[in-house]
């Protein structure tokens, strides 16, 4: 918690976040940003920031969920591959997947994805979404520009110029909301699955 809401309340587990110990709250939340930081050292070292006690089996399981195992298995040194400063020797999509794996190792109760699959292809993103769907006890907040990233969510919130515009499921919004319809038709009908058609 970096700052408090100016209106209303933010609740976790039905309880105002201001009632939680800050460190306990931060331990319960995992966040993956669009641009994450990887440290100099091995991939293993980087992943263990999520869980210092993780075994190799744990690391590989998280990498499978994040679809990082596919490119890791092609690296001669696997988990012991040295990363350049800031992860300069892996692609943007590979970096995002490693950061997702690292966050999954934390076993958070609340998982926040802030455009964190923007650099991966839609097939890989679909696999990651499928893996996340198996985390039934985890609350997932996904901030995204791709319709495909959020269309299976229990609830979708549309912000327009920083204000709450509409709330509903994919089917509800597609039936009644013009902004959602515009984004959908721009991305899906126009073949723009990467979300570049409409930005709000």
Model-flagged regions — what are they?
Residues 5, 11-16, 69-98, 116, ...:
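ABC-fold ATPase nucleotide-binding domain signature/coupling loops
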Residues 9-11, 19, 26, 44-85, ...:
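ABC ATPase nucleotide-binding domain helical subdomain, centered on the C-loop/LSGGQ "ABC signature"
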Residues 23, 29-34, 141:
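ABC nucleotide-binding domain signature
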Residues 74-76, 130, 151-200:
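C-terminal portion of ABC ATPase nucleotide-binding domains
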Residues 105-109:
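A short, proline-enriched helix->beta-strand linker immediately N-terminal to the Walker B motif
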Residues 111-114:
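Catalytic Walker B motif of ABC-type/P-loop ATPase nucleotide-binding domains
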Residues 121-131:
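Conserved D-loop/post-Walker B switch-helix segment of ABC ATPase nucleotide-binding domains
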Residues 133-144, 150:
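Conserved catalytic loops of ABC-family nucleotide-binding domains
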């Amino acid at each position: 918690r970096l700052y408090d809401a100016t209106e209303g309340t933010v609740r976790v587990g039905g309880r105002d976040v201001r009632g939680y110990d800050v460190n306990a709250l931060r331990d319960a939340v995992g966040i993956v940003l669009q641009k994450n930081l990887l440290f100099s050292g091995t991939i293993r070292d980087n992943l263990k920031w999520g869980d210092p006690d993780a075994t190799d089996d744990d690391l590989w399981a998280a990498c499978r969920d994040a679809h990082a195992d596919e490119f890791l298995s092609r690296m001669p040194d696997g988990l012991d591959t040295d990363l350049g400063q800031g992860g300069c020797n892996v692609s943007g999509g590979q970096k995002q997947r490693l950061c997702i794996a690292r966050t999954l190792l934390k076993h958070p109760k609340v998982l926040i994805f802030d455009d964190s699959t923007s650099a991966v292809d839609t097939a890989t993103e679909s696999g990651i979404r499928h893996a996340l769907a198996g985390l039934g006890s985890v609350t997932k907040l996904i901030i995204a520009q791709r319709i495909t990233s959020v269309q299976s969510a229990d609830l979708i919130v549309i912000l327009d110029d920083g204000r709450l515009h509409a709330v509903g499921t994919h089917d509800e919004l597609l039936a009644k909301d013009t902004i959602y319809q515009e984004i959908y038709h721009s991305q899906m009908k126009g073949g723009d699955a990467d979300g570049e058609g409409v930005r709000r």
